[in-house]
Amino acid sequence: MSKANTLVEILGSTYKIACPPEEADAVKNAAVYLNNKLLEVKESSGLDEKKAAIITALNITNEYLKNLSN
């Protein structure tokens, strides 16, 4: 399976993600979702980027696990 580089932007930084071409849109959508969640946490809490990333990861994991139970 071939991989292509997909560029995403999260908190003002650009990342090059290697993924199969057919998954590029999903990766971009995930990055937009993550960026929005990070901004929500940063703006509402005033936390630095590292702490906001940890809280955001915990929140997203909690959402994911709740959805698995349903």
Per-segment meaning from a language model:
Residues 1-5, 68:
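N-terminal intrinsically disordered, cationic/polar leader segments
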Residues 5-14, 18:
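N-terminal acidic leader/helix
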